[in-house]
Amino acid sequence: MAPNPRKSHPLLKMINNSLIDLPTPSNISIWWNFGSLLGICLLTQIMTGLLLATHYTADTTLAFSSVAHTCRNVQYGWLIRNLHANGASFFFICIYLHIGRGLYYGSYLYKETWNTGIILLLTLMATAFVGYVLPWGQMSFWGATVITNLFSAIPYIGQTIVEWAWGGFSVDNPTLTRFFALHFLLPFLIAGLTLIHLTFLHESGSNNPLGIISNCDKIPFHPYFSLKDILGFMLMLLPLTTLALFSPNLLGDPENFTPANPLTTPPHIKPEWYFLFAYAILRSIPNKLGGVLALAASVLILFLIPFLHKSKQRTMTFRPISQLLFWTLVANLLILTWIGSQPVEHPFIIIGQLASLTYFLILLALFPLTGALENKLLNH
């Protein structure tokens, strides 16, 4: 029999083992679609970003007008920009749902896959932040000023780090140039980390909604899940194009229609919606260093999740108390997102503080306690 190049060629063999003949649990649900959706998001962002970079000028005097020029004079420049800006939102929607799936179904017990995933999240957050600064609108400038300034809370070396990051004594031309360089570079780092993430995943194979070993019941990835993934792509790209074509500025900040001006501060400085939960946690602590530590902890706490798993069952499928707690956490994050968009005044301050406390309480104390309680209930 003639050798099949798909199974013998060194490169095709890797693709075959990852995307075609990959043994996949037969019962994985639509929640397992988000990994491939994140891959499509990354590809879309790199392609649209590359096209935007060809028309962008990383200079404080020209950045704003170069973006306006792209939208007005470049063929379909407006569409490319709208897809890129809103694509970031969809990227974060997918990654948050992907992490939520991991939490609910105990996928974090694949520690290497989980940890590389968190590093991917942090890299994505950094990429989105530096990218937001590039159009050089008011909120871009002041967002960059406020967030980079947080590093000055680090004792002794903080101020030096900030001035080193800025390339001067304030956010200016050197800052914009290096942010553009970073924004161009980081997506390729994300692509590399994704391959590591997948390598670790394929060491163990996918988890499934029951959280049990599924070696006895696996099916090939293609055609079953490749087809299911294509359906997922369509279901994501349709709302993305709808948003980009009908209301591209829905999720943006109106302040960014004003060119950056270091002399006037916007009334409410706030980041894009996908960072609002962390921003609310930052603001809920009246001390600068305390706020920065809470902000860092709000994301880095994910590294602790595998060690806080006390249940005998992997997933929450048959754990109703943990399910209730999980959805409480989701509601809590939505409240934090809303609070982050509100001005710092009563009653928003106290709501934000309570929601921040509840966030850490659920993850650090209530999840492990509930797991232990459910183990006890199983024995009776």
UniProtKB/Swiss-Prot annotation:
One of its GO terms (molecular function) is metal ion binding. One of its GO terms (biological process) is mitochondrial electron transport, ubiquinol to cytochrome c. InterPro entries: Cyt_b/b6_C (IPR005798), Cyt_b/b6_C_sf (IPR036150), Cyt_b/b6_N (IPR005797), Cytb/b6-like_sf (IPR027387), Cytochrome_b (IPR030689), Cytochrome_b_C_euk/bac (IPR048260), Cytochrome_b_N_euk/bac (IPR048259), Di-haem_cyt_TM (IPR016174). Binds 2 heme b groups non-covalently. It comes from the Eukaryota. Gene3D superfamilies: Cytochrome Bc1 Complex, Chain C (1.20.810.10). One of its GO terms (cellular component) is respiratory chain complex III. Its cofactor is heme b. The chain crosses the membrane at residues 34-54, 78-99, 114-134, 179-199, 227-247, 289-309, 321-341, 348-368. Keywords: Electron transport, Heme, Iron, Membrane, Metal-binding, Mitochondrion, Mitochondrion inner membrane, Respiratory chain, Transmembrane, Transmembrane helix, Transport, Ubiquinone. The keyword Transport applies. It is found in: Mitochondrion inner membrane. It holds the Pfam family Cytochrome_B. Heme b b562 binds at H84, H183. Heme b b566 binds at H98, H197. A ubiquinone binds at H202. It is a multi-pass membrane protein. Component of the ubiquinol-cytochrome c reductase complex (complex III or cytochrome b-c1 complex) that is part of the mitochondrial respiratory chain. The b-c1 complex mediates electron transfer from ubiquinol to cytochrome c. Contributes to the generation of a proton gradient across the mitochondrial membrane that is then used for ATP synthesis. The cytochrome bc1 complex contains 11 subunits: 3 respiratory subunits (MT-CYB, CYC1 and UQCRFS1), 2 core proteins (UQCRC1 and UQCRC2) and 6 low-molecular weight proteins (UQCRH/QCR6, UQCRB/QCR7, UQCRQ/QCR8, UQCR10/QCR9, UQCR11/QCR10 and a cleavage product of UQCRFS1). This cytochrome bc1 complex then forms a dimer. Heme 1 (or BL or b562) is low-potential and absorbs at about 562 nm, and heme 2 (or BH or b566) is high-potential and absorbs at about 566 nm. Belongs to the cytochrome b family. PANTHER family: CYTOCHROME B. This is Cytochrome b. It comes from Buteo buteo (Eurasian buzzard). The gene is MT-CYB.
